[in-house]
Amino acid sequence: MPSSDVEVVVVGGGAAGVAAARRFHDASVPCLLVEARPRLGGRAWTVTDQSGFALDLGCGWLHSADRNPWVAVAQAQGATIDKTPPPWMNRPLEASFPRSEHADFRKAFDEFYARLDEAARRETDAAASTLLDPKSRWNALLNAMSTYISGAELDRISLKDLDRYHSTDVNWRVVEGYGTLVSAYGADVPLMLDCTVDAIDHGGKRLKIETSKGAIAADRVIVTVPSAILAAERIRFGPALPKKIQAALGLPLGLADKLFISLQNAEEFETSVRLFGHTDRVATAGYHIKPFGRPMIEAYFGGRCAADLEPGGEAAFFDFAVSELVGVLGSDFAKRVKPICVHCWGSDPFALGSYSFATPGFADCRQTLAEPVDGRVFFAGEACSRHDFSTAHGGWLTGIAAAEQVIAARGG
């Protein structure tokens, strides 16, 4: 154990925690990063398949790349940034979505977001599903899209919160993996892995942080664990922090799981094309064919569909994917695909989901969650971001903001 007494402890080694700890390290502020997993990165996790390809099981896109601080980190690390337009910016495969129908869907999509923008200006909040046109044939697909974007269906999501998300529509990727990027950025900071934080006592002159490897005394702490972990009270606070728990309950984690599938005779397809299994139901996956030009498919499952499949593991996801793919591409297509890997984020004990959304009426919980307690207990993470929630750069920005608050509180 590096130290049982340190000035600042950062709890959680995801994007927010790594960014905060690195800021302290660079400012020569004594800090210890404590992470429950045997690795850094949190919900940014890259694995390597048998062909040597880096696969992002968690976040994979440098969203709003023209203002995303992880881009500069990637450049400094010498990582390869792929600026190929994302598949959702292109027209889907004709076999799954004829051109005329896709144009009609895009119109419905744009009209929905126009209604969202108008409704968000009103004082009252409501579920985003109230903005669906009851006569539209595209409501199921709009809902399916919501499960990829937010990890949840529109009936569960605050329209005000959804409208507050800011995107520049510039989306890049890191060939070596987003998870690789995040974990490497924290490699030089003092840290403890495989160490859960069970309780934080902030009632005394100094903080007492109870971990699976013993107690740590500290002056200040930044808590960066996912909102679902706080809501489940996996970390006990003394004195209790009921406002934080209530805020976290209003910011549940949606679910978005990715299944990677190997593809034979991939040259038949263009690079980075997309198809939907179905365009007339919510429980459908989105399929990104040949990402980076690789002979594989990234299959995206979200919301209740992903939750229903998780108990069955990789086999359930693959069976679902094959049934949809053969429906679009023919029965022989089943012979060309094999599962590579999937990670079930909802079943992950240190995440309990993928990324946060606000439930109707709870959009302002992000600010409540982000507020420090007595100038000693600080909070960060994508769920604390008003405009960049659900992203690794949202995690970074809140982590840096919390670190700067700590530095200011200690007088430089």
Stretches found by the model and what they are:
Residues 1-412:
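FAD-dinucleotide binding site
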